[in-house]
Each structure stands twice: as C-alpha cells, then as structure tokens.
C-alpha cells in the first residue's frame, strides 16, 4: 500500500534520533549506523517505528518496573511476528524535492512564455493620473494577461505546497498507521482462510453424493446361487408355444400384413408425413424423406390396439446407422408411449422434433469444429435453445453478418395449416439487414456446416462484387465500353467469385474477397496496393469501398503509365506543390489523380496536365502567369514560378490515346508530337481570345485533339481594315494598300523541328487577285511564303517554340504579303520583271535587256520581349508595334551599286517625290549615266593616275571634278519641254581655271558651242537626253584626255582607294564596294550627320569620289 515515510531528521522533531535500522518487507537495512546525536548528548536515544517494529528504543515510562518489561518482552518473542507491508512507501524528502524541481521547471516555462508576449507601449493619454492620484499602470491586454498568468501560477503552486504541509503532518503518525495496515492485512488473510475451508467442505459433501450405493440383497442372491430360482416369484403355468415352421411363419406374416393394411386404410388416422409407407414382413415402414424410416407392427388383431415400435433408421448424414443398447431401449419406450397416447401423429411429432433437434446439434458440433480449426478467430458460434447462430467475418469492421438455423413452425398466416409441420429453416442477416435465404445451398440430407457457410459467404461475396460492378459500370469509361469489366459469380464456391477490371489499355486488375475474413483482395502493382490499403474507410460499405479503391487504383495506373512513358520522350514531371497553386479547384470533382508535364522545347509559362477519373482520362493545357520573364532552359525551374498565378486551363482531349490505337512506344511518340501541336495551336487560340478583336473558330472549349490524334486547326477572320492598331503596319510611300486577301485564314500545325526547337505552323489563305503571274516566283532562299500553282491559295510558314503565340508574326507577315503584292504591281507598271518573291525580299530585273538585278529587302522591327506582346499589355497600347523599312541592294556588276544609299533614302522617304515609283523611275533614268561613268572610270591596270572624281549629291545630282585641271562640273537631271534631260554646268571659279585657257577654249568649242549624238551645247552648258548622256560624258572626258597635265600620284590614288573600301564596307555591310578599285569616299561637312537623318533632303547625301 503506498505511503510516505518521514526522513530521519523529521521524525519526532528536528535533530532527533540516532542510528536507525530500517526494516522494509521484514528485511533489516544494511545501512551503517551513523551517530547524529552528539550535539544533544549520548543519553538521549530516539525511537523510530517502522511498520509496527521498534528497534533500539527504550520507553522512559517503563524504566521504573524492569521486571514487568522483561516478562512482556519474553511473551512477545513467543508469538509470531505479523508480516509487514511496506510496498509503495517512499521518503517524504523525495516528494518534496520533486515538487520543488517541478515548481522550478514551471517557473522557467512561465518566464519564457511571458518573454514571448510583446507588451505594446502605453499611449500618452493613458498616462494621466486619475482623481485618486494612483496610477493604474500599463492596462494593455498583453500586460494584463502576464499578470493573470503570474497569479494563476502562484495560486497553483501554493495549493501544491499546502498539500505537502498536510502530508508532512500526517506522515509524522505514519508508524501507527503502518501497524494498522499490518493488522488489517492479517485479519483479511484469516478471513480468506476460513472461507476457503467452508468452500472445501461443501465441495466434498456434494461430490460424496455420487458415491452412495444401495445395500445389496444378500438373501435373494444366496437363493439364486444355491437353488437357481427365486421362490418369491410365482409360476403362472404357461406352456411354451409350439415352434413354427417356415410355412407357418410366412402365413402369419402375410396375415399380419393384411391386418396392418386394412387397419391403416380404414381405421387409423395416418398423418400426411406418413403417407409414404410400405408393408412387408409383418411390419409397416413409414418413410419421411431426409429424416427417418420407422418400422411398426401390431400386437393384436383388434384395430383399436396400438402399434408397436420395431426399428428406426435415420436417412440423413451424419447419423447412427443402427441404434443399439440403451439408446434403442429409450427409443422403444418413448415411441411406444407416443403411439399409445397420441397414435401415429404423436409418434411423428416426437420423431420429427427429435430429428430436427439432432440435426441442429450436428450442425452445432460441426460449426464448433470449424471455429476451432481453419476458421479460428473468424467464426463465433452460439446455440440458443434450438437455434444455431453462426457469426462469420467477425473481425471485419462495420455492420455484422450471421446465419441462424432453427426450427420453423410451418404455419402461414391466413392459410390452412392442417398439413403444415415444423421444419429446419434459415435466417440470413447480411450486414445487419435480413435478406432472402432461398438461394442458400442447404442440404438437409447431407448435413455440412462448412458447405452452408461457403454457400452463404459465396452469396455474400457475389452481392458485394455485383454491387461494386454496378457502381463501377455507372462510370463513363465502362458504360461506354472503352474499358472492359467482367464479373464471375457463383452460389456455392466463394473462391470462384471475382471481378476482372481493365485499368488501362495494357493493365488489368482482379478483385476478390477472402472467404474466411471477408477482406477484399486487389491484385495490382505492389506499391499502389500499399497506398490503397491505408485508404480504407470503415464508414463505407464493402461494395463502395471496393469501387473507391478500384477507382483510385485505376487512376493511379493510368497516370503512372503516362508518367513512365512520356519521360522517355523528353517530358519532365512538374511538382504542383512547387507552383503554389491549388489545382484541385481547377479540375472537376471526379478527378482522382493528376500529373503535370513540361517539355524543354516549350515556353516556360505553358504546361500540360494529365487527369484521370472513372469518367475518362483527359489532357489539359495550363497557362501560367509569371511576373518575371524566364530565360530558356532545358530543365523546368520551379523557383521562377513561385509567384506564378493560374491564367487559364482547358481540357484538350477525352482520353489519353485513341480507342483503336495499340499502346506502345510509337503511340507515345505520336502523343508527344500531338501534345506539342495542340499546345502550339491552343496558345494562338488563347492569344486571340485574350485579344478580343479578332474572331476565330472553333472556340476554346471545342479545340481538342481529334479522335484519330489529329491536331485541330484554327480559322481566324482577317480584314486589313479591322487589324488592331498595335499590329498595323504603315506601307512606304508609293505603295497602295487594298484588300487582296480573303477574310479567312487557316492555321495548321506541321510538326516540331527538334534541331531549331521550334514548331512549324502554316497559315493558309486565298487571294482575291489571280496569282498566275507570280505563282512560279517562289524564292529558293526563303521558303516562308509559297503560292499555289493553280488557284488563289498561298501558305505562310511561321516558326515559334510551342507555347509562344505566332499571331503577332502572322499579322506582320500578312501585311508584308500585302506590301509584296503592292511592290509586284508597281514593278509590273514600270515594265520591270520580277524574278522571285518572298516575305523578306523581292528580286527584279530591269534595263533594256533585263540583265540588271536588284533586290528589295522588306525589314520589320518589332519588340523582342514577350511581355510587350502580351494581350493584357497591348490592350492599353495605341501605337503600332511594327515599323517597316525597305532596303535595296545591287549585285556586281550592276552600276547602280555606287548610288545604293541615295536610292534607299529616296525609297523610305514619306514625301510625295519619294517611294517605289520614284525609285523605279530613277533606276531607268540613271542607268545610262551610271554605265557611262563605269566606262570612264574603267582602270584595268589600276596603275593610271587619278584623273576624275565624281560626287553624288543625290540620284539626280552629280559633281564631276578633274583635280589635275581644277575643273568642276555639275550634272543635274531636270524637266525640259515636258521630258527629263541631263544638264551639265561648269562650277569652277575663275581663279581655279585662270591658267587653263587652252582647255577652256577646247571645252567651249567641243561642248558648249557644239552638238553631238543626243546632246547639244547651250553656250554655258550642255543638255543631253537621258538615254544619250553617255555620249556627253565621253566627249567631256576626251577633252581632258588631251590635256598634258599629270593627274594624282599613284600613292594618292592608293590611299584614296583604301579609304573608299573601308568606308563603303562600313555602310553596305559587305565588301562589294571595293570592286571599284580607284574610288574614294570623301564625306562632306554634313555627310556624317546626314547619313543618320533620313528625313532630310537628298541634297545632303553621301559624296562618292570615283576615279
């Protein structure tokens, strides 16, 4: 019994006691004696009581009578010592130390807790003193909570130490209480001994009753042994009957048979159960199927006499084939009594009731053997009166199931029950509900409790599996026949019941139920099965639980199959938790499993999701909205999507694969291809939907992968007049913008180029103008534009990574196409021959023999950042994103390459005298001039001195300078008499030409006052036709050839040629300018600034010095 023992220093007051020998559980303590009484004198010896014992103590009150003390001590030694109870006692000091330690720990925790409470500073208004002059202090909720915690701690600890004080006062009398405990234990032990003795005597008396034997009759025994007879038994004098022969015996038996037959037919009331009988051998045999055969006979010829029992045989198994001995005698007595008292009906009732009871007992014994054998711990058997109750699946959670086998009365309410009799009946309680038991295999002839149980369990399993079958078949995947579902059910063998379920095209699942325990068994992937076993719910029925587990497992199998195969195609699994987005709200409620994938060829703000449910497997495209633009990487970096938000999500398919498609690596390769395609198409459809200014078809909800894994196409309406302002491109001057394209553009996906990491999307359209004239002009260098050979169709190729919209590029290219067609029409008007067309350039031939080639380059500038092309950003923008600029390039030996920049500046000016028409006219106008300059500047040996320099002010103004003679001329194209002519004027000052009178005279005679082929002098100048200006320049050059003045030195020419090569290369971006080996580019004072200001007049063009 637990208790508290005071320490040595606390018993009888502080400082008392000497060496104390503790005795616990009757054993003396081995602690050495330590003298603690030196300060109080050696004469004082303290007394310590431990469990009623006194050691080394002398009572001062007994010191007066020493003899009395000795007598009492002697008597006490003769009595046995009471056993001492000390279990559960512990020192009071330990209780105090633990209480103090606990108080210290609680105080430390309190201090830590109060340190975590942040007290808000008190406002200045609360610092005002009240009328009493006493400050209330800080009255913030945090400070008040701190004070309350301190008070609660102090009160709690105070209560604990008050309890310790009470315990300390009680423990000072612990010695007396310990004696009382020992005495109570002694009395209880004695009482139990007395009660045990009485019980033993009663049991002996009861057992001796069976040993009683009656006194033997020795007198009768002695007479029998000596005389062989008993005189007390009278002799009736009967003579023994005469022995019968075989013939007599047969006659008597036949007579008995007739008597029995007549009696049963006319006199006796035979119950319905005994209507099947046979008469033979002097007896009648009544047959009750599956129960017994009863042989009866007569003792007298009188029809009113009773029938007598002869024999009985049971017709069911297991049973005793023949009754012998005491049991047979018991049957004889009971049956004869029943026949005498109640006739055949009473006999049947007795035997029928006996057989029914016997059958129930047999089934009970079989059930007990099963419960002790293989069915251990899964069966519970009870026999209530004549009703056998067998509980099966006892360890299964939920509603219980059991089988009751008992005796039914056979009566039906409202019907005639004269022919009804009791019989064995079944009552089946399945999951707490009584159900019909007609289908249970119950053979009353061959009794087998195991067969009955197996039939009941088979029916129960069939019910569970059929219910699960119905639940699963309601889902769309199985009701539509896309996945197979088969059930095998039986009434007798539970092990043959099962479900075969197709999870995916390549995976199947079998469901069965263990007959003994009732646990459902699902044969699937081990890892998935382990996870599913933890998901079982006791609140669901077995069928619902199986259906739920099958649904989860099917979805897991579908997602696992997708994950394991698409990874081989370069897809990367994306953890949805890293995106900080609740995708459960995105998908329908019936989705059980989902997984996200990303491919390194895709844009980082697009992913695809595979979702699986019992109604179907779907692919989704998911668009993420990121705050930062991530660079392209081969690995999906979740850190760049921490702050991502969900922008859109759309289902794109009703299944992972085509229904008739064989699952394998080729099918997954096609799937990866078409996922990229649907992502590319869906990206552009989503872009058009967000743009809200361009109509398209089909809508996003219907933009799904077709059943044969074909990527759908988009049809968008394109009208040049309704193009959003941000996408509109202003055509250069001279180009006419008109409707040349029909209003419908078809976008189709044409694969992914893994080398370039782009998807190919082709835009198909039709022109409103015939294309026979330029259908064969497709460029061999740029395949982004193709025209149909027959018809009006065209195709534009667009390249972009899957996930990046091509709509801005399509808008640009369609307007480029309009620009190209406008250029083609302009060239046709100018009688120039177009050689090739593409979205980036137009190559054409011009000249009298169409032997000179020029290329018009169409260049467009657009934002490089994808954020600037976002529809949300474009909604607030009114300025166009695109700026178109035309460029012009000439190939060697085209003479116009010398004035390329001047012509380009004219091409892009917005003035009325600029544009493509003006450039075409300039090319035709300046062609004879440029060819003449080529002839004049021809220097095959590259060793002749530099004689002439040509400065191009613009395409219509040239300055010709002969530095050796200090003569300058200006050649200007102007209108004269409604047609263009070239006019040559001298610009040299009198100071420069003062020493060249002879040359001046020659010029006047041969040019100014002369006339030639296509030119004529004007006195102070020369006018020439545009086609004959070469003759004028040839004659001018002959005048200076006659001069003997030497030109520039070769060193000067070489340096000039070098500077021309460097400058022209910097301007044209190639080295074609170096073909004129004696040309020098010398910038005028305004040339550098003018080169960057295309809006200025052409008077400030570059200056080209040509030798």
Swiss-Prot record:
Region (Disordered): 1-28, 1081-1107
Residues forming coiled coils: none
GO cellular component: core mediator complex; mediator complex
Main location group: nucleus
Keywords in alphabetical order: Activator, Nucleus, Transcription, Transcription regulation
A Pfam family this chain is assigned to: Med14
Compartments, as annotated in UniProt: Nucleus
MF GO annotations: transcription coregulator activity
GO biological process: regulation of transcription by RNA polymerase II
Domain of life: Eukaryota
Alphabetical list of InterPro entries matching this protein: Med14_N, Mediator_Med14
Entry similarity comment: Belongs to the Mediator complex subunit 14 family.
Subunit structure: Component of the Mediator complex.
Function: Component of the Mediator complex, a coactivator involved in the regulated transcription of nearly all RNA polymerase II-dependent genes. Mediator functions as a bridge to convey information from gene-specific regulatory proteins to the basal RNA polymerase II transcription machinery. Mediator is recruited to promoters by direct interactions with regulatory proteins and serves as a scaffold for the assembly of a functional preinitiation complex with RNA polymerase II and the general transcription factors.
The name this protein goes by in its record: Mediator of RNA polymerase II transcription subunit 14
Organism: Aspergillus oryzae (strain ATCC 42149 / RIB 40)
Gene designation: rgr1
């Amino acid at each position: 019994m637990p208790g508290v023992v005071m320490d040595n220093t606390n018993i009888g007051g502080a400082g008392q006691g000497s060496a104390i020998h503790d005795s616990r559980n009757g054993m003396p303590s081995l602690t050495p004696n330590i003298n603690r009484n030196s300060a109080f004198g050696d004469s004082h010896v303290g007394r310590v009581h431990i469990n009623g014992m006194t050691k080394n103590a002398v009572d001062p009150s007994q010191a007066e009578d020493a003899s009395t003390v000795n007598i009492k001590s002697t008597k006490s030694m003769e009595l046995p010592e009471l056993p001492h109870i000390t279990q559960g006692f512990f020192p009071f000091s330990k209780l105090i130390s633990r209480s103090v330690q606990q108080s210290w720990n609680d105080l430390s925790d309190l201090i830590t807790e109060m340190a975590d409470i942040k007290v808000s500073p008190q406002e200045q208004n609360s610092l005002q003193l009240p009328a009493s002059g006493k400050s209330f202090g800080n009255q913030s909720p945090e400070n008040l909570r701190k004070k309350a915690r301190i008070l609660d701690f102090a009160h709690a600890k105070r209560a604990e130490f008050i309890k310790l004080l009470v315990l300390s006062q009680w423990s000072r009398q612990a010695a007396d209480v310990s004696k009382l405990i020992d005495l109570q234990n002694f009395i209880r032990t004695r009482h139990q001994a007395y009660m045990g003795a009485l019980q033993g005597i009663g049991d002996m008396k009861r057992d001796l009753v069976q040993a009683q034997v009656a006194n033997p009759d020795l007198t009768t025994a002695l007479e029998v042994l000596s005389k062989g007879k008993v005189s007390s038994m009278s002799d009736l004098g009967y003579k023994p009957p005469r022995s019968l022969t075989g013939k007599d015996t047969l006659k008597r038996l036949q007579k008995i048979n007739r008597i029995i037959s007549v009696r049963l037919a006319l006199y006796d009331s035979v119950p319905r159960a005994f209507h099947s009988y046979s008469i033979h051998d002097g007896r009648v045999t009544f047959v009750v199927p599956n129960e017994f055969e009863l042989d009866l006979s007569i003792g007298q010829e009188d029809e009113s006499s009773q029938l007598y029992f002869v024999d009985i045989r049971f017709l069911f198994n297991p049973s005793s084939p023949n009754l012998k001995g005491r049991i047979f005698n018991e049957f004889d007595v009971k049956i004869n009594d029943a026949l005498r008292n109640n006739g055949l009906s009473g006999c049947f009732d007795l035997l029928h009731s006996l057989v029914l009871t016997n059958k129930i007992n047999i089934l009970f014994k079989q059930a007990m053997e099963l419960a002790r054998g293989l069915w251990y711990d899964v069966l519970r058997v009870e026999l209530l009166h004549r009703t056998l109750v067998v509980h099966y699946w006892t360890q299964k959670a939920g509603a219980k199931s059991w089988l009751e086998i008992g005796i039914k009365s056979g009566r039906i309410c409202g019907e005639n029950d004269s022919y009804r009799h009791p019989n064995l009946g079944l009552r089946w309680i399945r999951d707490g509900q009584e159900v019909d038991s007609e289908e249970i295999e119950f053979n009353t002839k061959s009794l087998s409790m195991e067969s009955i149980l197996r039939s009941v369990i088979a029916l129960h399993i069939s019910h569970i599996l059929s219910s699960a079958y119905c639940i699963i078949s309601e889902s769309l995947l199985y009701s539509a026949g896309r996945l197979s579902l088969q059930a095998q059910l039986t009434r007798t063998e539970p092990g043959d019941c099962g479900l075969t379920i197709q999870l995916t095209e390549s995976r199947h699942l079998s469901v069965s139920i263990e007959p003994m325990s009732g646990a459902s068994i699902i044969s699937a992937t081990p890892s998935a099965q382990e996870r599913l076993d933890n998901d079982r719910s006791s609140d669901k029925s077995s069928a619902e639980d199986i259906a739920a587990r099958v649904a989860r497992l099917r979805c897991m199998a579908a997602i696992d199959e997708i994950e394991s195969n698409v990874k081989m195609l370069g897809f990367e699994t994306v953890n949805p938790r890293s995106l900080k987005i609740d995708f459960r709200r995105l998908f329908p409620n019936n989705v059980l499993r989902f997984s996200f994938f990303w491919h390194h060829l895709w844009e980082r703000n697009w992913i695809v999701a595979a979702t699986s449910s019992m109604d179907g497997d779907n692919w989704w495209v998911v668009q993420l909205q990121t705050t930062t633009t991530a660079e392209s990487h081969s690995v999906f970096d979740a850190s760049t999507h921490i702050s991502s938000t969900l922008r859109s999500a759309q289902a794109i398919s009703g299944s992972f694969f085509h229904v008739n498609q064989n699952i394998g690596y080729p099918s997954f390769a096609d799937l990866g291809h078409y996922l990229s395609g649907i992502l590319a198409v869906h990206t552009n459809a989503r872009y058009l939907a967000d743009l809200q200014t361009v109509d398209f078809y089909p809508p996003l909800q219907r933009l799904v992968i077709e059943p044969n894994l074909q990527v759908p196409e988009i049809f968008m309406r394109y009208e040049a007049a309704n193009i959003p302002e941000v996408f509109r491109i202003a055509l250069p001057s001279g180009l006419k913008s008109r409707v040349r394209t029909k209003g419908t553009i078809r976008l189709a996906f044409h694969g992914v180029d893994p080398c370039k990491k782009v998807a190919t999307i082709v835009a198909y359209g039709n022109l409103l103008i015939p294309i026979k004239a330029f259908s064969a002009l497709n460029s061999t260098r740029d395949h982004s534009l193709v025209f149909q050979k027959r018809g009006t169709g065209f195709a534009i190729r667009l390249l972009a990574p899957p996930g990046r919209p091509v709509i801005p590029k399509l808008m640009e290219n369609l307007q480029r196409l309009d620009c190209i067609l406008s250029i083609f029409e302009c060239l046709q008007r100018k009688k120039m021959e177009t050689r090739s067309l593409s979205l980036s350039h137009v190559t054409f031939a011009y000249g009298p023999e169409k032997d000179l080639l020029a290329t018009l380059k169409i260049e467009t500038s657009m934002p490089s950042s994808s954020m600037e092309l976002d529809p949300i950003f474009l909604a607030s923008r009114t300025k166009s994103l695109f700026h178109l600029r035309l460029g012009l390039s000439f190939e060697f030996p085209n003479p116009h390459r010398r004035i390329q920049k001047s012509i380009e500046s004219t091409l892009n000016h917005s003035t009325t005298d600029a544009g493509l028409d003006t450039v075409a006219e300039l090319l035709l106008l300046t062609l004879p001039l440029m060819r003449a300059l080529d002839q004049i500047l021809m220097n095959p040996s590259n060793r002749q001195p530099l004689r002439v320099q040509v400065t191009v002010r613009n395409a219509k103004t040239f300055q010709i300078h002969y530095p050796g003679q200090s003569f300058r001329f200006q050649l200007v194209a102007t209108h004269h008499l409604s047609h263009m002519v070239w006019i040559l004027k001298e610009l040299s000052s009198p100071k420069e030409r003062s020493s060249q009178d002879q040359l001046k005279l020659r010029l006047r005679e041969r040019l100014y006052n002369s006339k030639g082929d296509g030119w004529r002098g004007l006195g102070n100048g020369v006018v020439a036709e545009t086609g004959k200006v070469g003759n004028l320049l040839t004659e001018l050059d002959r005048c200076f050839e006659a001069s003997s003045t030497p030109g520039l030195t070769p060193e000067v020419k070489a340096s000039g040629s070098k500077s021309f090569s460097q400058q022209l290369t910097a301007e044209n971006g190639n080295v074609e300018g170096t073909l004129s080996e004696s040309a020098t580019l010398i910038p005028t004072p305004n040339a550098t600034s003018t080169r960057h200001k295309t809006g200025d007049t052409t008077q400030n063009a570059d200056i080209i010095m040509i030798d």
